[in-house]
Structure formats: C-alpha cells, structure tokens
C-alpha cells in the first residue's frame, strides 16, 4: 500500500519508460503528418498538403460523418439501457433469472467480437428473409451491434457506482413519502451522474474504435472510419492517415480536458454544498430538509 513517501528512482524510471513507449509514437505520427514527402518515413520538409488533401477526400469525410453519428447514437442508447440494467442488478437483488440476466449483460464484454458480429449478421439476414427488415445493412445494423456491446460496459460502471452509494438517502426519502420514480431522478441519478458520463464517453470511444463488428454489419455505402483506415493501411502507409490521426488525437485531447474540467467542477460544487450543509445548524423537526440537502 502506498504510504505517501516519494517514489523510488527505479520506479520513476520505469514509469518514464512506460510513458515514453506510449507517447513517442503518437508524437512522431503528429510530426510526420506535416511531412511534404509521400514517403511517411522520409522527411521531405514541412507542409500542410496532407491536411488539405484530407479535407478534400470525400471517402474519409463521409466515413468520419457516419462514425460520429453512429457513436453518438450508440452512446445515448447504451447509457439509457445500461443505466437501467445496472440499476436492476444493483438494487433488485436476487430474483428469478437474475443470474441469467447478469450473465447476458456481461457476455458481450468477454465474447470475441468475431462471434458477436457473425451472430448478429446471421440474425439480420434471417430477419430480412422472414420480415423484410432491415432492408439493407448500414447505419441501423451497426448501431444495434455497437449498442449491444457498449450497454454492457455502461451497466457494469453504473452498477459499481450504485453498490458504493449509501442506501440511507433513498430509504430516508421513502420514509418521507417520496415515490420510487422521484427518488430515482432526484437522488439516485445525480449520485451516479459521473458514472453515467464515464459510460457515455466510453461508449463513444468503443464505437469509434470498432472495426470487427462494423465489418460484419455494414453494407455498401456505410463504411466507417476504422474500416477506411484499415483498408488504406493494408495497401501501404498513407500520409493522409497521419494527418487524420493527428486531428483525432487533438480532438480527443480537447474533449477529454473539457469532460474532466466539467466533472471536477461538479465535484467541487457538491463538496462545497456538503460542507455548507454541515456548517449550517440543523433545525428541530427539519428531517425532510436534511434529506433534501444531502441529496
């Protein structure tokens, strides 16, 4: 267990090597995205030609647009379904079929994506034969596949947070006559908001990064960004990919900084509210106000 003492120099050296191993390739990739040469490993001078070429590449722009739409739609659906599933797993305890339900929720996390993608492809083909829907594979089929995967991660994150929360606040609200739905939205949901935000960001990341499932569930005209990158890299290293990766790193970095800032600001606000509530003297018979303040 860490006791607050300074880290040994040897451990600092190992950490430094680990960070260098992780981030030197990213830095070199960003540097070579400004390379004027078509050979990505030979420096030919500073140029932004590949960024201009990237903006003019309709295939990549279309893939980026589709991937962002799928990622945002997946994150919204996964957060809603995963939060409900996590609440059921954490609050409903043992019920008939609870073990099966928990296993089905966590199965997409441990099942190989090849199996998931192939099974869903066969499902959609069978549905098309019997019901005529979906008429084609594209946005909808990829969205369903990504939601199935991401909701499992959201459910696990939300369930872990709910287990840590003291149930006394919810029980006190119930004693004061609050309905279960009101308790969920006014007490439980704010307490798990950080877990929900983490699940939302994780779902976006998983969706944007997915290649295997999208390869099975996509059709003509519905190529996602990872599929475009993979197809171009198979034919050889392309300087446009370096430019695309550099833009992605920049956008992800900005997005993460903003998300962390908002989450830290919300945490500071809650801590100040709790500190103010603890300093304020309690009034006799004001149990309802105490519960409302704590929530």
Language-model region placement:
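Interhelical loop and adjacent transmembrane-helix boundary motif
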Residues: 2-8, 38, 51-60, 208-261, ...
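Membrane-embedded alpha-helices of multi-pass transport/permease systems
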Residues: 24-27, 31, 80-84, 118, ...
């Amino acid at each position: 267990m860490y006791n607050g003492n300074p880290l040994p120099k040897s451990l600092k050296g190992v950490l430094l090597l680990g960070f260098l191993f992780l981030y030197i390739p990213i830095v070199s990739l960003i540097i070579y995205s400004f390379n004027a040469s078509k050979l990505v490993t030979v420096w030919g001078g500073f140029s932004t030609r590949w960024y201009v070429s990237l903006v003019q590449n309709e295939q990549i722009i279309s893939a980026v647009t589709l991937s962002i739409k799928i990622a945002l739609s997946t994150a919204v659906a996964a957060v809603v379904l995963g939060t409900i599933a996590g609440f059921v797993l954490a609050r409903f305890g043992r019920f008939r079929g609870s073990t099966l339900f928990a296993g089905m929720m966590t199965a997409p996390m441990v099942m190989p994506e090849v199996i998931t993608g192939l099974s869903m492809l066969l499902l959609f083909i069978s549905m098309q034969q019997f019901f005529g829907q979906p008429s084609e594979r594209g946005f909808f089929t990829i969205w369903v596949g990504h939601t199935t995967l991401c909701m499992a991660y959201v459910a696990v994150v939300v369930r872990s947070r709910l287990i840590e929360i003291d149930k006394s606040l919810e029980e006190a609200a119930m004693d004061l006559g609050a309905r279960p739905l009101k308790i969920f939205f006014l007490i439980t949901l704010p307490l798990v908001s950080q877990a929900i935000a983490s699940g939302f960001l994780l779902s976006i990341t998983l969706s944007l990064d997915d290649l295997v499932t999208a390869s099975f569930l996509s059709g003509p005209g519905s190529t996602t960004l990872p599929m475009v990158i993979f197809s171009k890299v198979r034919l050889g290293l392309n300087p446009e990919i370096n430019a695309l990766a550099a833009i992605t790193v920049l956008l992800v970095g900005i997005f993460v900084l903003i998300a962390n800032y908002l989450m830290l600001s919300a945490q500071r606000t809650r801590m100040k509210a709790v500190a103010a509530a603890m300093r304020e003297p309690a009034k006799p018979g004001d149990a309802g106000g105490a519960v409302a303040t704590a929530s």
